[in-house]
Amino acid sequence: MTSGRNISVSEASRPKLPRHARLKFDETRQVWVILAPERVLAPDEIAVEVLQLCDGIRSVADMVDQLAAKYAADRSAIATDVIAMLQDLADKGFLTEAREATL
């Protein structure tokens, strides 16, 4: 069942972790985890790298450009994978979208 608050991820999206979730390195297990009320998710290394870019400021397009340059990889392939991963996390309630910036 979905909450109705999920986002539809596109290259224009500016995803971030919601207030109730934190990306944290678990020293005991030596893995990165997303901590949310009554839930823990252990993303893989690639997901962690993408999640660390999800600051609500960068757009998905900016993240894809950065990753494509870093890994000298095909931008369209990275975009497809990043959007699919972020959409999956959003559908599970681990991501939200930044609202318009207030200065």
Sequence positions of predicted segments:
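Acidic, low-complexity/disordered tracts enriched in E/D and polar residues
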Residues: M1-V48, Q52, L103
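Long, charge-rich, low-complexity alpha-helical segments
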Residues: A36-L103
